Amino acid sequence: MALNRNKKKKIIKKINNVANKSLSIITANPSKITVNIINKLRKKAKINNIKIYVIRNTLLKKSLKKTIFSKLINIIKGPILVGFSMKHPGSASRLFIKFNKKNINFKILNAIYEKKILNIHEIKDLANLPTHIESITKFVILLKEISLGKFIRVLQNITKK
């Protein structure tokens, strides 16, 4: 489908707005992946509050100008699938890594978080970041263990005396 100038401007504006609201961005090469499989990925992304776009490189480059992801402009080459994490910085990375395990042809290219370009190892670290709820849960469990541990030690000291 041919895009006229107005449609291209709308796409650029839309992607720019999403980029300004997102916490991190990840790119992948979707070639050799069927549309049906990409649509399944989109459904999972929607559930996890991740915006996914397959967009022309020139439009993506123009929409990333004057955003915190502008470093990506010089790197973009070939077919691109872009994922924007909207709530948690590692959510798009986590989704792409899980998807990559099931689909070997899906190649994760780059990610940017806090104005830094991440390599594949850093992308995995970003994906392993706990979410807000996971962090709070771990903290509460830690507090319970600390208080229970003290209580048990007190009981042991009482029984020894």
Swiss-Prot record:
Q: Domain of life of the organism in this record?
A: Bacteria
Q: Which Pfam families match?
A: Ribosomal_L10
Q: Name one GO biological process term.
A: translation
Keyword list, A-Z: Ribonucleoprotein, Ribosomal protein, RNA-binding, rRNA-binding
Q: Name one GO molecular function term.
A: large ribosomal subunit rRNA binding
Family, per the entry?
Belongs to the universal ribosomal protein uL10 family.
Q: Quaternary arrangement and interactors, per the entry?
A: Part of the ribosomal stalk of the 50S ribosomal subunit. The N-terminus interacts with L11 and the large rRNA to form the base of the stalk. The C-terminus forms an elongated spine to which L12 dimers bind in a sequential fashion forming a multimeric L10(L12)X complex.
Give a short account of what the protein does: Forms part of the ribosomal stalk, playing a central role in the interaction of the ribosome with GTP-bound translation factors.
**Know the name of this protein?**
Large ribosomal subunit protein uL10
Please give the organism. Answer: Buchnera aphidicola subsp. Cinara cedri (strain Cc)
What gene name is listed for this protein? rplJ
